[in-house]
A protein has these predicted regions:
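Aromatic- and histidine-enriched alpha-helix N-cap/loop-to-helix transition segments
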Residues: 38-41, 151, 180
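Generic protein-terminus/edge-of-domain signal
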Residues: 1-67, 74, 82, 99-111
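Short, Lys/Arg-enriched, Trp-marked, Pro/Gly-tolerant hinge/linker segments that flank
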Residues: 113-124, 138-149, 158-204
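Ligand-binding loop in jelly-roll beta-barrel domains
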Residues: 73-98
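Amphipathic, well-ordered alpha-helical segments in soluble domains
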Residues: 42-45, 126, 130-133, 152, ...
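Helical hydrophobic small-molecule/effector-binding pocket
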Residues: 94-103, 124
Length: 204
């Protein structure tokens, strides 16, 4: 596929009708994912596999338990090595949730043009514990399921914001590469999602 054609086919994917939704996925596929965007925010928690995640011109080389913040309308795609299984948690978050303070990390990721959270071992264990409890709660039919699930979601997002806003993560320049040409095209697309995004327009 030609360089400009990759971006002319950018489309909105996924629909979210609740405040948040958690997925735990493990698969092995040869499918190539096109650049796309969502109307909601997304957190990707990478567990295992060989994946390069492209967000707005940056290509992140992921390590186990890396976390990615994908702002709504941010154009992104995953580049997956099909030779090994790819396991991850995906958290979708509605833009109009009651707790707007929890969206600050996405806004800051957009401002910094940096989306990766790489944790030290102590913080990694803390976030793992909350995440696994959240997953268990979403699958439970026990008393107070909705309240417990919501409280665990809030815990996870509060800690995620603290870590990112206070820069408690490990910053490693070798963890990503940056392509200014791609970044310029994606920036144009991001500001013109309802306009003509044909190959001719993008390559003009």
């Amino acid at each position: 596929m030609l360089f400009s054609e990759q971006f002319s086919q950018t489309e909105k994917t996924g629909y979210l009708n609740e405040d948040f939704r958690l997925f735990h996925i493990k698969d092995q596929t040869k499918k190539e994912f096109a650049y796309h965007y969502h109307d909601f925010h997304k957190v990707v928690i990478f567990i295992s596999g060989k994946v390069v995640y492209h967000i707005e011109g940056k290509a992140y080389q992921l390590r186990p338990w890396d976390i990615l913040l994908v702002n709504r309308h941010a154009i992104h795609r995953s580049e997956i090595d099909p030779s090994v299984p790819y396991e991850r948690f995906i958290l979708w978050i509605q833009n109009d949730i009651l707790w707007q303070e929890l969206l600050k990390c996405f806004q800051k990721a957009n401002d910094r043009n940096y989306n990766l959270i790489r944790l030290n071992s102590a913080l990694q264990e803390k976030m793992k514990d909350i995440l696994f409890e959240l997953e268990t709660s979403t699958k439970s039919d026990g008393y107070g399921k909705e309240i417990l699930t919501q409280s665990l979601f809030l815990q996870f997002m509060v800690y995620l914001n603290r870590i990112f806003l206070e820069k408690q993560y490990i910053f490693d320049k070798k963890s990503y590469t940056f392509d200014s040409q791609i970044a310029c095209i994606l920036q144009y697309i991001n500001h013109n999602l309802k306009e003509d995004l044909s190959v001719e327009t993008l390559s003009a």
